[in-house]
Amino acid sequence: MSDMHSLLIAAILGVVEGLTEFLPVSSTGHMIIVGHLLGFEGDTAKTFEVVIQLGSILAVVVMFWRRLFGLIGIHFGRPLQREGESKGRLTLIHILLGMIPAVVLGLVFHDTIKSLFNPINVMYALVVGGLLLIAAECLKPKEPRAPGLDDMTYRQAFMIGCFQCLALWPGFSRSGATISGGMLMGVSRYAASEFSFLLAVPMMMGATVLDLYKSWSFLTAADIPMFAVGFVTAFVVALIAIKTFLQLIKRISFIPFAIYRFVVAAAVYVVFF
């Protein structure tokens, strides 16, 4: 593979990762399809995907750095208030409660989960995840009990964490599972999305660093330019995608995302079967 060809592949996959990682459309499904079409598969490809995920995570840190510092008691300027005055405040406990279910389940069933990484399981997950998005839009309370992040209860955070367990099924979409769960628990669409992004930082950082440690041997000095291009591209695109997504969901529901998931599932079927 020539240098220019590998850098082009890195840029394409960086765009795909950045666009889809935090949208409820399954980055796994997209990466499987695009990686297959580009002929970029195998151990090096898996390590590359881990590295560019770090770029996407960094975008969330940059977007929500004030809120993240606030979770550990460090505040800059006036206290954050999203939608009117709130009696409470989002704390580190909310994040920990949102993490516990998936962390426990992920550790217990780690090997089983890894065995699910194949096109057929991803295809089914895309469909089921799309149905959950539709269910969340149809069944959510008319008036959210938690219009803003600081209105969320510990129970809501824990229940969102339980929904996050669905994302252990490859192709389901972590953001799709957590946002849908939040809406069903009475959290507004916007606040549920913000909480999903905040929850992604420790969850994805931990999983990504662990995967990177295990696959470090597949990274060579010759791969560094390619990995750097993918990392930076994923970071920039994810930053734009998150900002756009948060503005978009103020005006539209998640139904279009659900329909898109069904289209991607059909694409997986066509490409692999």
Curated annotation (Swiss-Prot):
Catalyzed reactions per annotation: di-trans,octa-cis-undecaprenyl diphosphate + H2O = di-trans,octa-cis-undecaprenyl phosphate + phosphate + H(+)
Keywords from the UniProt entry: Antibiotic resistance, Cell inner membrane, Cell membrane, Cell shape, Cell wall biogenesis/degradation, Hydrolase, Membrane, Peptidoglycan synthesis, Transmembrane, Transmembrane helix
Domain of life where this protein originates: Bacteria
Gene Ontology terms describing biological process: cell wall organization; peptidoglycan biosynthetic process; peptidoglycan metabolic process; regulation of cell shape; response to antibiotic
Catalytic class of the enzyme: hydrolase
Enzyme Commission designation: 3.6.1.27
Residue intervals passing through the bilayer: 6-26, 45-65, 90-110, 116-136, 190-210, 222-242, 252-272
Free-text function comment from the UniProt entry: Catalyzes the dephosphorylation of undecaprenyl diphosphate (UPP). Confers resistance to bacitracin.
Family: Belongs to the UppP family.
Entry protein name: Undecaprenyl-diphosphatase
Gene: uppP
